[in-house]
Structures are given as structure tokens and as C-alpha cells.
Amino acid sequence: MSLLFSRCNSIVTVKKNKRHMAEVNASPLKHFVTAKKKINGIFEQLGAYIQESATFLEDTYRNAELDPVTTEEQVLDVKGYLSKVRGISEVLARRHMKVAFFGRTSNGKSTVINAMLWDKVLPSGIGHTTNCFLRVEGTDGHEAFLLTEGSEEKRSAKTVNQLAHALHQDKQLHAGSLVSVMWPNSKCPLLKDDLVLMDSPGIDVTTELDSWIDKFCLDADVFVLVANSESTLMQTEKHFFHKVSERLSRPNIFILNNRWDASASEPEYMEEVRRQHMERCTSFLVDELGVVDRSQAGDRIFFVSAKEVLNARIQKAQGMPEGGGALAEGFQVRMFEFQNFERRFEECISQSAVKTKFEQHTVRAKQIAEAVRLIMDSLHMAAREQQVYCEEMREERQDRLKFIDKQLELLAQDYKLRIKQITEEVERQVSTAMAEEIRRLSVLVDDYQMDFHPSPVVLKVYKNELHRHIEEGLGRNMSDRCSTAITNSLQTMQQDMIDGLKPLLPVSVRSQIDMLVPRQCFSLNYDLNCDKLCADFQEDIEFHFSLGWTMLVNRFLGPKNSRRALMGYNDQVQRPIPLTPANPSMPPLPQGSLTQEEFMVSMVTGLASLTSRTSMGILVVGGVVWKAVGWRLIALSFGLYGLLYVYERLTWTTKAKERAFKRQFVEHASEKLQLVISYTGSNCSHQVQQELSGTFAHLCQQVDVTRENLEQEIAAMNKKIEVLDSLQSKAKLLRNKAGWLDSELNMFTHQYLQPSR
């Protein structure tokens, strides 16, 4: 593909060169025209390129999302280059080839110009002398007009006579004045090729040669000294060109020995005179001025008759033979000499004008293109370095994000397990401590001091205060046993969480973690609710004789079985005999098998049933005992029994009732509290779990904020990298475009500025 592109470029270049050579062969002046068109096109492209570069640099400089990749100085430099290129483009658009004709008065300067233009454009001949500088250039219009110096007024000059009359009537014109003669291009083809012809007054009529040179000669590409072949070069003519040579480096000077047709009258002296003129002119150009080599001097000195050439060309333009009329001998030779001068002049001025008008600007354009290319290369490198840095930062943040996610997952699993272990340990500690406190409940109840009275109203208040005392005492004792250890364990776990998650947070947040994570003073709430728990407690503070029938049965059988025995019924349910044993390896139990307790209940129940059936049973038993021990022992027993009854009855005071009440309450409360041991342990473990989970949740919230910040930074980095990548592409494109413009300038230099080999 690159080979094909290279071949295409080569073909295009060859075609351009061929077209260029064809134009040059057609007219040497086309060389300047094509060069001007080419350089103007290059500067137009250069201006558009610098405008694009300036806009790009300014937008990049003002992009707040980017770190600086260009400087304000670079932006101002490129804007300065833009103004310079625009100024040069305006100058190039006005550039043209300029030839200045100088010589003594009436040497035929205007006639030479008219002969070159194939028409009587400037007044010449007898009675007409040029009294100011005349600048002849083409115009696209169809009417000729004059422009005087310092005025935009167009003065009509349709014919040479009108022009001559206008010039002589204007009294303000002096030798140093400039009048522009704008002549239609359609009438003079030579003017189409950006050629300006400068006619001048005779250099022998003024002493203001220095001001003439400064004003009219510094931008001239070729100087033509029109000399009179009937005399030698005058010192005035030499002096003027010495001054020109001092102000300009190696000016292009042609010497026309005009009126050479006069030599035809003396043919025997023609060659001798020609040789003398050639030697003197060559010596002047080579030895005195040093503007050409001796080998090149022959191409700068010509012997012509401008009047003959002008007349011949006017006749040819009118359709008549150019050799018609009375012509001196040797006309064709002099015509050929004039044509040879024109050819050499055109070649010289086109080469010289291209070099003097375009070379400096071409060099400046190359410098500007190179400067902008270096700026674009600098921007490209800065953007590339910043992109690499952003990619490293993005990768670092991505790694950080992955580390946080992985570490958070591991820590969550670890802390979940540890929280479970701590809650189980808390439940075990609370359950153990509560069981021990229940066993010591009687001590706590005995510590309760309040006036006791068996009336229902006082008992209700007594119970409520006892409930409060029990709940506060149990809570205090449980707190002394468990809270300190549990709180220490919880705080240790919280600190471990903070230490574990702190590395996942930014450095700026780590020092503020204690303020970001709320850590309130934790205390266990045991929530025993003794008033509700013991709401069904029913005290029994009525007097009961210790050896009474009810108390004895209650003592031996317990409250439940004594009630069954005293009520006189048997609620025993006969066990059915299964058809098949539940366990084939074990034989079925016999139907009459009873436990020892059931056997005792059955005996006493039977006895009670017997005594309840008939009062005769008492007499029978009493008679049996009477016969066995005697009446004295029976009387003594009844006496002691009665004394014991009286004693217990007398000692059944309010204090005794209070002790009975507290004993009954301890038994009832112990039974109820045993039922809530598991619940209380679970409740405390749940409180610890909630506290630890809340701490971990707050820490995770801070980690989530860090993750969100990292994700936002990664997204910003991605956007920034995308912008930087676009900047690099644009900067690279503009850098390469500068290289392309440089190659265009090099091609222009090779085609138009380097001398042909």
C-alpha cells in the first residue's frame, strides 16, 4: 500500500514538474507566476493550519479537566505566528516582478518599454521627456487610467497623447514623484505575468539619487541601463549604479546600447565600436560593480534599436509585415538582439524575482512550521506522559478497589464468625450467672426489708416493692458478674473491627474514624420483668399445725399428691397393654407394676377411704392401740400433741407469716426464673450482636464511601485518558501536517529557488 502511494506521489510530482517546465518554456515570466501561485497556496494552507493549531492549543490550555500539557506562552506564540503568516500572505499577494529602467535623458528608456509592450504605452519621441517615475502595470479592466502618488483618484488616460498631456499639465509632479499607469492586460500580454515596468527621469537631471534608490529601487529585481551607443558610458550613469550596488547585494543589471541602428551608416567601424562598447561595459559590470562573472557578462550587454523594434511590432500588430518601411541595414540582427535581450531579461527577472520575493518568506514559513511542529510534538509528549500517569493511577485505583472488595469479604466472614462466638459466650455467661443468682435468691429476698401485714392492701404493695427489689437486685448482681467482661469483650471486638477496616480507608479518613463511627457506652439490659413473671403468685399465710393430718400428708407425699390423697380420688390412669411391644427386644411390662411413690399413695388413699366410710374404724384403731400401749401413754401423747399445737399457734406471728411469705415467694420466683434463663441469655447475646453488627455496618458504610470515591476517580480517569488520547491523535495529526507543509516548502525551494543544474 505504501509502495502504491509512493508511486502515485512520484507520478503526481512528475506531472507537476512537466507542467511547470511547459509553462516555463512557454514564457520565462510564467516561472514567477506559477511560483507565486504555488507559494500563495502554501501560505494559505499554512495559515489555515496555524489557525487550527491555535484554536486547538487554546481549547487544550483552557480545559480545566486536564493537567497543563501546554503553556500560555505557546498559545501566544502560535497566535503570533498566525498574524505573521497573514501579514506575509498579504505581502505575497501584492508581490510582482519589477524592472527599473535608468539612463540619461533622451536615451530611449520609454521607447524600450514601449517596444517590450508592443505598443506606445508611454509618451516617447521628439518633444516628450519623462519628468517623473512612471510605473506601468496591468489591470483587468478595459480602460487605462492614472494613479498619482498619495491619491486614489483614477484619472482617465485612453491614449498616449492624453497620458502625455496629463503628465505635463500636472504641475505638482516632480522628478521624485510616482505615477502609476494602469494599462489593460488585454492590450499588453506582457503585463499579465505580474510584471511591473518602472520608467525614470534622466539620471543626469537630479542629484537626489540616494532618495530615488531608497524609494524606487530597493524592491527592483532587474535594472536596465539604457545607454546611447553613439557615445560611451558616462560617469553619471556609472555613479548611479555604483550607489545601487552599494545598497543592494549583486543587483541584476542589463546594459542596452540603444540606437545601434546608427552604426549601419558606418559599417566599416561597426565591429570596432561594438568591441569597444563591449569591453567598457564588461569592465563596468565585472571589474567596477562585480555583479557578474566575465563569462556571464556577454548575456547582460546588448546592442539594439528600440525605435526599430517598436515600429516593427506595431506594424505586425496591425497586420503589416514587420520589415516593411525604410529600415537600416542589419535590422534583423538588431531585432534578434532585442529578442535575445527580452529572453535573457525574462529568464533573469523570473529567477531573481522568485528568489528575492519568495526565498526569505519561504525560509520564514519553514521556521514557523517547524516551531509549530515542535510545539505539537511537545504537546503530544506531555499528553502521552500524562496519559501514562493516568493509566498508572487508574490501575492503582482498580487494584485498590479489588483489594478492598476482597479484604472486605474476608473480614466480613471473619467478623461474622467472631460475633457468633462472642454472642454464644455471652449467652452462656448470662445463663450461668442467672442460674447462680436464682440459687441465691433467698438471700436477696431476705435482704428485703418492709413492714409486713397480712391485709390484702398491704400485701399488694409489699409484693410490688418486692418485685422491684428482686429485679434491681438481680440486675445489679448480673451486671457485676457479666457486664464488665462482656463490655470489655465487645469493645475489644469493636477495636479489632476498626483496626481491620482502617487500612481499607483513605489516610485522611483514618484519623477521623472515631468521629465517623458512633461508639456509645454499651450496657446490657437484662429485662427480667419480675412483676409480670410472678403475677400469678398466691401466698398461703394461714396457720397450719405441723403435725396435722394435712401437713403430714403434704410432708410425705408433696403438695400435689397430698391433695389427691386428701380429696379421696385416684386419678391414676391404667396403662394399656400394647398389642405388640414397642421394642421387640424388650419384654412388655407386667400390668400390676407400680412405683414406690404410687404404692404409698395407694396405701394412704385406701386408709383414708376406709376411715371415711365409717366412724367405726376410729374405734377399732383406738381399741387396738389402747390394748397395746395403755391409756397413760395415749393421754401423754395427746397432751404433748396439744401443747405443741398451742405453742405453734402462739408463735404464728406477723414475722412468722412474713417468713412463710418470703419462703413461698422464693420457691415460686425460682421456678418462674428458671423458665426465663434461656430467654434472658438470648436477649443479652442479641444486644451484643446488634451492637457489634451496628459498628461493623458503620465501618462498612465508610468503606462504601471510599469505594464510591474510587469508582468515581476511575471513571474520571477513564474520561481523562480518552480526552488525552484524542489530544494525542490531534497533536500527532497537526505535527504530521507541519511535516507535510515543510515538504511542500522543500519542494517549492527545489523547483523555484535552487539554481538549475
Curated annotation (Swiss-Prot):
Protein's UniProt keywords contain Lipid biosynthesis: no
Biological process according to GO: aerobic respiration; apoptotic process; blastocyst formation; camera-type eye morphogenesis; mitochondrial fusion; mitochondrial membrane organization; mitochondrion localization; negative regulation of Ras protein signal transduction
Main localization (coarse): mitochondrion
Region (G3 motif): 199-202
Effect of residue 112 to M: In CMT2A2B; uncertain significance
EC numbers: 3.6.5.-
Protein name: Mitofusin-2
Originating species: Homo sapiens
Gene: MFN2
